[in-house]
């Protein structure tokens, strides 16, 4: 939900100039696991978005999977329509499909982390807290969802 937080921060930029500079610096920093040291120019050498695909797509998939309970087919269909909107980046159908596959693999594969997550705030209408909105076994299999993604046309 990084994209949603960016929109909230943009609102704060307009309302509080003192916070704006600090928040802008934080938001403009690319998400990175920081496993690799910075390059010779001091720039981040490893950017997660380059590996997993667009965060815009991942946020779209997450919202429609968790909040709406949509199937991979419906999410793919809606994503193809949504990216045609003038305010979104253009993504090919193949890019959407590949990113959806990565999303499901990571979503299921990382469930164990959510099962023991610390308390935190809820931003928006979607929460993955195991104490509230989201309950999913850590050993769930992604096979059914990946099969649906593979069959997308």
Where are these regions (language model features)?
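ATP/NTP-dependent adenylation/nucleotidyl-transfer catalytic domains that generate, transfer
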Residues: 1-153
């Amino acid at each position: 939900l990084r994209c949603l937080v960016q929109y909230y921060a943009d609102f704060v930029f307009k309302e509080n100039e003192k916070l704006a500079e600090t928040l802008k610096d934080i938001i403009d920093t690319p998400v990175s696991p920081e496993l690799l040291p910075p390059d010779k120019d001091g720039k981040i050498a490893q950017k997660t978005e380059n590996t997993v695909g667009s965060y815009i797509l991942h946020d779209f998939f997450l919202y429609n999977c968790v909040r709406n309970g949509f199937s991979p087919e419906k999410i793919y269909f809606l994503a193809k329509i949504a990216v045609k909107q003038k305010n979104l980046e253009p993504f090919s159908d193949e890019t959407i499909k590949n990113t959806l596959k990565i999303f499901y693999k990571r979503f299921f594969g990382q469930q164990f982390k959510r099962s023991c997550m610390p308390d935190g705030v809820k931003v928006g209408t979607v929460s993955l807290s195991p104490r509230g909105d989201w309950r999913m076994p850590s050993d769930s299999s992604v096979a059914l969802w990946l099969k649906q993604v593979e069959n997308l046309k």
